[in-house]
């Protein structure tokens, strides 16, 4: 299950998470984001209980995008213990995302 992040739940869901967190920064008008969306959903199912999968709509949550230095979308950031440890900018294959996650768990 993917969690929609906003300024109210970001700290608890990402920064204070006991497990690694994958955060997908996206926008509805972004073509590559639409291509990545089913991959992110698949990752949420595949890693359920091991990795928390979250999404941030940059149009609705500009402050979170700025806080994470998002300049291009889609951008996926992996967090461990509240710290960003890996950033993947642009559309990637599921293998790329799985490799990045597997390095952390």
What positions do the PLM features span?
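Structural microenvironment flanking redox-active thiols in thiol-disulfide oxidoreductases
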Residues: 58-66
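A short beta-strand-turn-helix
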Residues: 3-21
């Amino acid at each position: 299950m993917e969690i929609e992040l906003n300024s109210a739940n970001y700290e608890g869901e990402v920064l204070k998470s006991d497990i690694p967190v994958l955060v997908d920064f996206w926008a509805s008008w972004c073509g590559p984001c639409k291509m990545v969306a089913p991959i992110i959903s698949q990752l949420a199912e595949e890693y359920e209980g091991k990795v928390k999968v979250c999404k941030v709509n940059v149009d609705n949550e500009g402050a979170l995008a700025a806080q994470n230095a998002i300049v291009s979308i889609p951008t996926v950031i992996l967090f461990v213990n509240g710290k960003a440890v890996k950033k993947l900018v642009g559309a990637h294959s599921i293998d790329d995302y799985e490799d990045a996650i597997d390095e952390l768990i």
